[in-house]
């Protein structure tokens, strides 16, 4: 590691450690007005709902009066969630690393005829090693971005996302380190693979997609927000960032504080003054903090074109 890399690391952690941890959450929440969510009559779809942030969001939605479809890969964890949540929560097993599984989820939702009022694109993975799915894609790209795009576009195209519906995309503060780069999304080089870097590129793309969707569907009164939870003690952090976790474990956020903004956004649906923003601790924040991430040869349109073509490639092969 050279001096330039060390300087970037020190600058990043120096800037964000207090804000992104439980310390920042505890300080800010003292100034918040109390909100009693009322989600009565709403149906939510929460991805990656079997644990961590997704589980907390699904349970909070049920407690607010919503009915919830919880989708995740682990049938065992989904069963445990359903037992805790009660009859207002239904589960569907879906591996969001796979386009085929996500397509089957869309088909099942269409057959049930259940319109979605709130979609939370929460599922995500941060991996140590380069792996590919059975469909030949880098696993974290497929999970963190491609099937988010597929699911959201599919719900809208099928008329399953209600007019006036809400989409919340779960990003990460890691996106602050990188610009939009379509080329970096589906990492082809196993030798040069960095799970942390790949995760950051996927999460930056989520931010760009959110702005794109909001522009495109504003006439239908749909709301699209992207947020990040701060630094939460998730399974991905435990698995892929053990040193980071060991140093900061005592101040990492739990699932409830990490997911608070998602519930608040759904309950209040605030107006977003800036076209581009990422929500964090109940406030719209800038999507760039470093000048180097503002400049990219790619645009929202090139990103959407790439994801659309990637989905079409597998459909044509089938």
Where are these regions (language model features)?
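Conserved glycine-rich cofactor-binding loop
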Residues: 43, 50-51
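Short alpha-helical oligomerization interface
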Residues: 129-143
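C-terminal helical subdomain
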Residues: 7, 248-287, 301, 305, ...
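Rossmann-fold scaffold of SDR-type NAD(P)-dependent oxidoreductases
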Residues: 47, 114-124, 144, 168-172, ...
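Non-catalytic terminal and boundary segments that flank Rossmann-like NAD(P)-dependent oxidoreductase
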Residues: 1-43, 179, 297-318
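Conserved glycine-rich Rossmann-like NAD(P)H-binding loop of the short-chain dehydrogenase/reductase
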Residues: 64-80
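Rossmann-fold cofactor-recognition segment
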Residues: 85-100
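Catalytic loop of short-chain dehydrogenase/reductase
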Residues: 124, 128-132, 163-221, 228-245
């Amino acid at each position: 590691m050279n001096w330039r890399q060390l300087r970037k690391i020190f600058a990043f952690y120096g800037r964000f450690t207090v804000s992104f941890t439980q310390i920042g959450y505890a300080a800010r929440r003292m100034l918040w007005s109390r909100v009693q969510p009322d989600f009565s009559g709403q149906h939510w779809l929460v991805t990656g709902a079997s644990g961590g942030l997704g589980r907390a969001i699904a349970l909070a939605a049920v407690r607010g009066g919503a009915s919830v479809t919880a989708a995740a890969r682990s049938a065992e964890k989904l069963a445990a969630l359903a037992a805790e949540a009660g009859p207002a929560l239904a589960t569907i097993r879906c591996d969001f690393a796979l386009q085929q599984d996500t397509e089957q989820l869309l088909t099942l939702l269409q057959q049930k005829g259940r319109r979605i009022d709130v979609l939370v694109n929460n599922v995500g993975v941060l991996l140590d090693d380069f792996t590919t799915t059975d469909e030949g894609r880098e696993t974290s790209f497929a999970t963190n971005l491609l099937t988010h795009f597929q699911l959201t576009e599919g719900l809208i195209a099928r008329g399953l996302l209600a007019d006036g519906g809400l989409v919340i995309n779960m990003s990460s503060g890691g996106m602050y380190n990188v610009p939009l780069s379509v080329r970096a999304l589906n990492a082809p080089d196993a030798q040069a693979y960095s799970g942390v870097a790949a995760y950051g590129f996927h999460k930056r793309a989520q931010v760009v997609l959110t702005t794109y969707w909001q522009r495109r569907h504003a006439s239908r009164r749909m709301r699209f927000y992207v947020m990040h939870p701060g630094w939460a003690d998730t399974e991905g952090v435990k698995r892929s960032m053990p040193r980071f976790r060991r140093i900061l474990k005592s101040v990492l956020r739990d699932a409830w504080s990490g997911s608070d903004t998602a519930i608040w956004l759904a309950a209040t649906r605030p107006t977003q003054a800036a076209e581009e923003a990422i929500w964090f601790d109940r406030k719209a924040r800038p999507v760039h903090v470093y000048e180097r991430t503002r400049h990219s040869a790619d645009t929202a349109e090139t990103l959407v074109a790439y994801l659309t073509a990637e989905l079409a490639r597998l459909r044509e092969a089938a």
